[in-house]
Regions:
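Sec-dependent N-terminal signal peptides
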Residues: 1-6
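N-terminal signal peptide c-region/cleavage motif recognized by signal peptidases
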Residues: 9-11
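Transmembrane beta-barrel domains of Gram-negative outer membranes and organellar outer membranes
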Residues: 14-275
Length: 275
């Protein structure tokens, strides 16, 4: 989801860079398992902790394996196991569970939509609240050459330090040929809903991205630049994904679009949290 770890001053949580995607409503086929590995490196990031006891994002490697399973042609379940590596120290951020509802066959529609609910349990170095909820609407349009997708995300933290933040993400991309896209992705965190942070303390990051396939493997690569003081200045993101064959078929050709939660990726376009 983008979210650069760290902010000016203290906030209740450090928005993690474990998953940087814009969801495009693509899901796994019924009975299909997909696996993605997210890896994101903060080359130039925040050097101060986002809250007392938190860890700064500078020179950190963040990621998560993502497992998704298609329940129906409009419903998918997913599991994440986020982590970070910094100064040769491995830090686990527990787990996230998600349930995604979409318009069926979203990868074949000119207008597509959906909504994702993601429940997370986070460790003390990553957040001051243990439990959180992400609500991510998905709205997109595409034609033969272009696609435009918006995820107006609301991140909710529960407990004493909890708050609801507005953290939208968006993507515009052009299709160069089958399974090859280039474009821009934008991730932000405006802060608490009803009391947005000053601009300098908001997170706004712009990524140049490309999605392509190597055999049956989907690859998403992007380089992001932070536009405000509170944003990580330089972030490199990658997603490597594979959709297992649907039971009863001979190959893995029956894969949904991916890039949304990027799951069965027809083309790996989008998802993100802010980041």
């Amino acid at each position: 989801m983008l979210i650069a770890l760290g902010a000016v001053g203290y906030s209740s949580h450090a928005q993690a860079t474990d998953e940087i995607q814009v969801y495009n409503a693509g899901i796994a086929a019924v009975g299909q398992l997909t696996v993605q590995q997210h890896l994101n490196y903060v080359g130039i990031g925040q050097k101060d902790p986002p809250f007392p006891g938190g860890f700064p994002s500078n020179h950190s490697l963040n990621g998560t394996p993502e497992f998704a399973y298609g329940m129906t042609d409009w419903w998918e379940l997913g599991l994440y196991l986020p982590f970070a590596v910094q100064d040769r120290q491995f830090l686990s951020d527990a787990f996230k569970l998600r349930t995604l509802f979409v318009s069926p066959n979203a990868d074949k529609r000119n207008l597509f939509y959906g909504i994702n609910f993601e429940l997370s349990y986070e460790m003390p170095k990553f957040a001051q609240t243990r439990w959180g909820l992400e609500i991510r609407p998905i709205i997109g349009v595409r034609n033969a050459d272009y696609e435009f997708i918006v995820n107006p995300i609301v991140d909710v933290g529960f407990g004493r330090y909890g708050e609801a933040d507005f953290a939208p993400a968006a993507r515009v991309a052009r299709k160069l040929k089958d399974d090859v896209y280039v474009g821009l992705e934008y991730y932000a965190d405006f802060g608490k809903i009803g009391a947005f942070s000053p601009l300098a303390e908001q997170q706004h990051t712009l990524f140049a991205v490309t999605d392509f396939k190597v055999g049956d493997v989907d690859i998403d690569f992007g380089v992001g630049y932070g536009l405000t003081r509170a944003s990580d200045r330089l972030v490199v993101k990658t997603i490597i994904g594979y959709a297992f064959p649907v039971p009863g078929t001979k190959d893995s050709s029956e894969r949904a679009s991916a890039s949304g939660p990027i799951n069965p990726m027809a083309h790996l376009s989008a998802r993100s949290t802010p980041y």
